[in-house]
UniProtKB/Swiss-Prot annotation:
Family (UniProt): Belongs to the WrbA family.
Function (record text): Catalyzes the transfer of electrons from NADH and NADPH to reduce quinone to the hydroquinone state.
Protein residues bound to NAD(+): Y83
Binding site for FMN: 81-85, 183-236
GO molecular function: FMN binding; NADH:ubiquinone reductase (non-electrogenic) activity; NADPH dehydrogenase (quinone) activity
Protein name as it appears in the record: Probable NAD(P)H dehydrogenase (quinone) FQR1-like 2
Residue ranges of every copy of the Flavodoxin-like domain listed in the record: 75-263
Keyword terms, alphabetized: Cell membrane, Flavoprotein, FMN, Membrane, NAD, NADP, Nucleotide-binding, Oxidoreductase
E.C. numbers: 1.6.5.2
Native organism taxonomy: Eukaryota, Viridiplantae, Streptophyta, Embryophyta, Tracheophyta
Cofactor(s) required for function per UniProt: FMN
Ranges of compositional bias, category Low complexity: 49-60
Pfam families: Flavodoxin_1
Length: 273
């Protein structure tokens, strides 16, 4: 105890120091992946794991079975898109997921709740029938999710909400608990809900016990480009649709691809024994 009641470090044990973390490199996808935590080194011996700290002493670790991943990890990109804006992000997001070894993405549409007559009156384009509709029961086969939807008054569209409402049986059994998920959105204007549409959707994950995975600022310099209008936020990728005629820019699509890559890295990390 020092003068004035302040604590001073022991002479025998110096406080640990940490080095500077890696910087952001826009041309290197590896730096956009989650930063590895190496304070403790974990080694696998047969079917048991042992954690060894940096001081060279062995400490007890939770006994686990070293699971051998024989098939690719699956990320379901589940979306609703009336005019194709969310769909364009979804397809680019799949590219990002598939770029990570050992992880693959599958695109799914949620069912339309509007009648065909209403859809035609709204002049919505024909849906891509090569992308199948998904049922709630199929969600259990995924290791992670990326949900995409347009905004309606700052919240997810009714079609996506109806799909989440159909997952009651999964909620009852907590079948999706512990699985990571992220969001991507489409709004008409800059103030139309790029952030609120995502964070109001988090409640769907909470009740299922799922893990929300935002992208933060892992996209690096692309998150700070101000030379042109750009959708997307720390919550996830996004696109501005305007009056419906505006298409996603390359920056918006690149952010979607990055989110797919980032989510794949997270899912892969969580699957490690």
């Amino acid at each position: 105890m020092g003068k004035g009641g302040g604590c001073v470090p022991s002479k025998k044990k110096k406080p640990a120091t940490t080095g500077d973390g890696p910087g952001i490199d826009d041309d290197n996808d590896a730096t956009n992946a989650p930063i590895q935590i190496d304070d403790d080194q974990t080694t696998i011996d047969g079917d048991r794991t042992t954690a060894t700290n940096t001081g060279g002493t062995t400490t007890p670790a939770i006994t686990t079975t070293a699971a051998k991943i024989s098939s690719p990890l699956k990320i379901f990109v589940v979306f609703y898109s009336m005019y194709g804006h969310v769909e364009s992000l979804a397809k680019r997001m799949k590219k990002g997921v598939d770029s990570v070894e050992g992880v693959e993405a599958t695109l799914y549409r949620v069912p339309e709740t509007l009648s065909q007559e209403v859809v035609e009156q709204m002049k919505a384009p024909v849906k891509d029938l090569e992308i199948p509709e998904i049922t709630a029961a199929e969600l259990t086969a995924a290791d992670g999710f990326l949900f995409g939807f347009p905004t309606r008054y700052g919240c997810m569209a009714a079609q996506m909400k109806a799909f989440f409402d159909s997952t009651g049986s999964l909620w009852k059994e907590q079948s999706l608990a512990g699985k990571p998920a992220g969001f991507f959105v489409s709004t008409g204007t800059q103030g139309g809900g790029q952030e609120t549409t995502a964070w109001t959707a988090i409640t769907q994950l909470v009740h299922h016990g799922m893990l929300f995975v935002p992208i933060g600022y892992t996209f690096g310099a692309g998150m700070f480009k101000m030379d042109s209008i750009r959708g997307g936020s720390p919550y996830g990728a996004g696109v501005f649709a305007g009056d419906g005629s505006r298409e996603a820019t390359e920056t918006e699509l690149a952010l979607a691809e990055h989110q797919g890559n980032y989510m794949a890295a997270i899912v892969k990390r969580l699957a490690q024994p």
